[in-house]
């Protein structure tokens, strides 16, 4: 398959070992995924609606990215044809790059609002709000603030922990957000930055607001997904768990470090239920030849098995199979469909 999710640059902290305690697991029902690969440079992004400001598509080191110029700002929303698309339990992920020396900017502000406020810009109206400023610099901060329509309370900005500081140039950072009813968690790479437990219900839409200073900001791999129920409950009632959190390098079977959230979840499940046996199934989208996709998916399933065995799960409890593109669960004609089809499934076996 030609994976439309773009690779992230490796860093000294980006290793399977560094992510060994990572607990973020993406939602299992894709709502939105922005594949920019077919777009033209200097054009307005096709799948982000700009309420105010400036953003465009550019090529950076051979891949298409959402580009916010230096000394600019933009307020934008995902182009999703629903008045309200955020459920009570959901995840948001994207990769961000900025070489700015932090001095109040750059900043990303994420507003989660009631549907009737989806077109607001530069307003503190909403249900809750997440802010990232400075990213990996020594002065980087993050905040998760609960809002009461027009006022913000709680969740003052906190400085990045020292372990999350990474000042390397051209360094992609992975942002992750988990929301489940009144609980919210914010991550940068493998580090959890914030947690709150007083979110009020009613947020249905997302607004992204970004401001830059002397350097541009780049964003890619924007993904929104609805969260699933308890993993063991899904396995018993549905017979399988569909995982989108297990990620691989493009056209390879090498696990990305951020896969450890989903792998840790599966390890804990198998560790707690010692009689459980599963088949690990690799699945691809329909891009490329069926033979290549089948081999790739089989190798990826084996890579997941190898990691679980390394962590202490008996090999006899784990079977593997590569299905390639033979079992699609969505239409391969859309970015979201392709993303849904690129998955790892854990099936209960006797």
Model-found features: residue ranges?
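Beta-strand-rich interaction surfaces with strong enrichment in secreted/lumenal proteins
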Residues: 21-22, 77-84, 160-167, 208-209
